[in-house]
Regions:
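N-terminal auxiliary segments of SAM/dcSAM-dependent transferases
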Residues: 1-40
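Soluble, non-transmembrane catalytic domains of enzymes that act on hydrophobic metabolites at membranes
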Residues: 23, 28, 42, 145-150, ...
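Short, basic/glycine-rich phosphate-binding loops at helix/coil junctions
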Residues: 35-44, 144, 176
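Surface loops and adjacent helix of pleckstrin homology
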Residues: 44-46, 112
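A short, flexible beta-alpha/helix-coil linker loop
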Residues: 46-48, 149-152, 184
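Loop/helix-junction capping segments adjacent to catalytic residues or to phosphate/diphosphate-binding pockets
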Residues: 50-51, 188
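The AdoMet/dcAdoMet-binding core of the Class I SAM-like
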Residues: 54-170, 192, 212-217
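C-terminal substrate-binding/active-site "lid" region of AdoMet-derived donor-dependent transferases
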Residues: 155-222
């Protein structure tokens, strides 16, 4: 069935939710739902962009001061790109953003449904964040957003020391990271609770539970 024109779809969405489904090799089916003029990207079990996730990240960014609006930012797990307006419009960040996203189907939806594409100040890379990060230059980013989910599951690499060591390496001294995790996920790199391991690694750690399932870690590289 052909899609309704954008303006008509928006008007119809005030009467009934409109959903388009896109197959994903990583997340089963992606669902783009328009309801009362507002569009969200979901899987069968989780919000990926522009819904609850955006609210969680907005809350977390309240704990991340803007030291330098022009400083470079790294986003690990772009999804549909709902973190970008938070960085640009709400925090006033103007610097370059490098965004890594594993799923090409998600990037296609980001481009066609949300107009999120690479441009002069946004470099989008379709890659595995855990493979990409070790090749990034050291001390490159003032802020990193870590939002690496596959549906409602965290990748096992988040429980390994290597990822957090690489994250520390690519942050500038004094740089910060906002990490979106799950309260139900037990992460024990090198046999230590994650916050304890991160403090020994050289981070100041703030641990926040939000929205029942989400756990936010606010990190700052100390040296």
């Amino acid at each position: 069935m052909r899609l309704l024109p954008t303006t008509v779809r928006r008007l119809v969405s005030y009467l009934v939710p409109l959903t388009r489904r896109v197959p994903s090799a990583y997340s089963g089916w992606l669902e783009i739902t328009t309801w009362r003029g507002h569009k969200t990207l979901n899987t069968a079990s989780a919000n990926y962009s522009y819904g609850l996730l955006q609210q969680v990240l907005r809350y977390g960014l309240r704990f991340v001061p803007v030291a330098d609006a022009a400083a470079p930012v790294l986003v690990l797990g772009l999804g549909g790109g709902s973190v970008l307006p938070l960085l640009r419009h709400e925090q006033g960040r103007t610097g370059p953003v490098t965004a890594i996203e594993l799923d090409p189907a998600v990037l296609e939806v980001a481009a066609t449904e949300f107009d999120v594409r690479s441009g002069p100040n946004l470099h989008i890379v379709c890659a595995d964040a855990f493979a990409w990060l070790p090749a990034a230059p050291p001390s490159s980013f003032e802020l990193a957003i870590v939002d690496l989910f596959l549906d409602l599951t965290l990748p096992t690499e988040l429980g390994e020391a290597a990822f957090w060591q690489q994250l520390w390496r690519v942050l500038q001294p004094g740089g910060r990271a906002l990490c979106n995790l799950l309260t139900t996920a037990e992460l024990w790199p090198e046999g230590q609770p994650l916050p304890e391991f991160l403090e020994e690694l050289g981070f100041a750690v703030q641990d926040i539970e939000v929205e029942q399932l989400n756990r936010l870690l606010i990190l700052q590289r100390l040296a």
